[in-house]
Swiss-Prot record:
Segment forming the signal sequence: 1-25
Database matches in Pfam families: JHBP
One BP term from GO: positive regulation of circadian sleep/wake cycle, wakefulness
Family statement: Belongs to the TO family.
Transmembrane segments: none
Keywords, ordered alphabetically: Biological rhythms, Signal
Designated name of the protein: Circadian clock-controlled protein daywake
UniProt key word Signal: yes
InterPro entries noted in UniProt: Haemolymph_juvenile_hormone-bd (IPR010562), To_sf (IPR038606)
SMART domains, per database record: JHBP
Source taxon at top rank: Eukaryota
Species name: Drosophila yakuba
């Protein structure tokens, strides 16, 4: 069968498209991220910072979710007996974390190694001047002798947040001969200087009663944080684990770094 010039052109276009698809499948880190040398922590920190700034809307073609805001899903919180005056059951739905990607300062990123015989233990440290969680809330509880049963919008502002993320990732060899990182554990630990709660529709928005109740709740920030903060950390861990796993899914670990 003799190929016409048009057929040859179409054949080449098909081959180029196939090659392009094969390259895209393992093209490494998306621009503007760059590879670093393994032990060059300053470069690793800079690339982590770039990731937060450059991909606030996520990377849809790689199934990487948005970083601003970050979807935290639903959190269920029950007071743990830290205060006799405050008892509650709180459901936060459609929760989202704001202000991280556009204000975070990455301080340290350590733990990468050439040894693929055991899991990697990564530690990421970062600071954020203010984070904000917004959600729909449903609360059933009491403050002193005052019942609090309400639904509405909730905002939690957290100031001067120091975060440590501990990530365990296992190298898994695939049929292509390359090893890829599979995250097996992700923990978030935070230290917060202070915070503030705001809830709409308390007591049918009776202004005087609402404001006096919020004043007492915010005076009890440290007590409330003992119950609320771990649940936010847990939700953040789940969200970031999915984001990072999607980023790493098709990047062979041997393509993470420049040659030494």
């Amino acid at each position: 069968m003799q190929l016409t010039s048009a057929s040859v052109c179409l054949l080449w276009m098909g081959l180029l498209s196939w090659v392009s698809h094969r390259i895209d499948a393992s093209q490494g880190f998306p621009s503007p991220l760059k590879r670093c040398k393994l032990q060059e922590e300053s470069c690793l920190v800079a690339q982590a910072q770039t990731f937060f700034q450059a991909f606030q809307k996520g990377i849809p073609e790689r199934q990487v979710a948005a970083l601003e805001p970050i979807d935290l899903g639903t959190m269920r919180i029950e007071s743990g007996g830290h205060s006799e005056s405050l008892k509650f059951k709180l459901v936060m739905s459609d929760a989202k974390l704001y202000n991280l990607a556009n204000s975070v300062v990455v301080k340290s990123l350590k733990g990468f190694t050439k040894d693929l015989t055991k899991p990697l233990k990564l530690t990421l440290l970062m600071d954020t001047p203010e984070l904000e969680v917004r959600a729909k809330y449903d609360v059933d509880g009491k403050l002193l002798i005052l019942p609090i049963v309400s639904k509405g919008d909730l905002t939690i502002r957290m100031n001067e947040v120091q975060t440590k993320r501990r990530i365990t990732a296992e190298p898994v060899k695939r049929s292509d001969g390359h090893s890829y990182l599979n995250i097996t554990d992700y923990k978030t630990i935070t230290k917060i200087k202070g915070g503030h709660f705001d809830l709409s529709n308390l007591f049918d928005d009776n202004k005087e009663l609402r404001e006096s109740t919020l004043k007492v709740l915010n005076q009890e920030w440290n007590t409330l944080a003992l119950d609320v903060q771990p649940k936010i950390n847990e939700a953040c861990s789940k969200a970031f684990r999915a984001i990072l796993q999607s980023l790493w899914a098709n990047i062979p670990y041997d393509e993470f770094f420049k040659a030494e």
